[in-house]
């Protein structure tokens, strides 16, 4: 993997100096996203009001924007925060949840893309549609395999000059030049609502820890998530027990275990 340090080293650095991550995420995801960041060692702040989102983004270590439960007022806050983060040189992550579903969502995402996100994280259907392709997404769920979105991700990364992460059974990360696949996780993960949204927040935490290596930070976040998912699945009876086991596994994951178990290959 062509990064400047290992996922484990980034995880250790994050815990030694916890980043403050502003998460503008949806109502469904707020609780689990905050708990995922706490378990990983970061500090969450769920600040989305237009009256303060921009001001807060200037002092946060990173910003994440998820359009899951969208409204005009939320869009104002998202845009203010994205502009402030960019002006302050802070990394920010865009999660374009089901942006293809309505004109309202498509327009909101187009405006956010113009503000140059550092990282774009989505499922295969979202990334394919974002690149102008025809996706088979149904609501917030992807009906396209990750490998089908790899070309779209490369194109989008080059066009936006951003790192693009496509998450699914096997994750794919590219900056338009480099690309890797990340194996791991569990089939139970899609059965826990908003777990993927919480991954977007974790990507922001790693980006804040290693802003000089955004590609490596994104790979580290996805690897951390995958290994925690594998560990949580051991002994889980179903999605309910998996959800709390996931937080425990994430909190218990150490740098050495992460580096030993991460399965990252060039793509």
From Swiss-Prot:
List the GO biological process terms. thiamine biosynthetic process; thiamine diphosphate biosynthetic process
Keyword terms: ATP-binding, Kinase, Magnesium, Metal-binding, Nucleotide-binding, Plasmid, Thiamine biosynthesis, Transferase
> Which pathway does the database say it acts in?
Cofactor biosynthesis; thiamine diphosphate biosynthesis; 4-methyl-5-(2-phosphoethyl)-thiazole from 5-(2-hydroxyethyl)-4-methylthiazole: step 1/1
Q: What does this protein do?
A: Catalyzes the phosphorylation of the hydroxyl group of 4-methyl-5-beta-hydroxyethylthiazole (THZ).
Entry annotated with the keyword Nucleotide-binding: yes
| Classification of source organism | Bacteria, Pseudomonadati, Pseudomonadota, Alphaproteobacteria, Hyphomicrobiales
What the entry lists under SUPFAM superfamilies is as follows: Ribokinase-like
Q: Which cofactor does it need?
A: Mg(2+)
Q: Where does substrate bind?
A: 46, 194
**Superkingdom as given in the UniProt entry:** Bacteria
One GO term in the molecular function aspect is: magnesium ion binding
The coding gene here is thiM
Output the Gene3D superfamilies linked to this UniProt entry.
Answer: 3.40.1190.20
- Name-wise, this protein is Hydroxyethylthiazole kinase
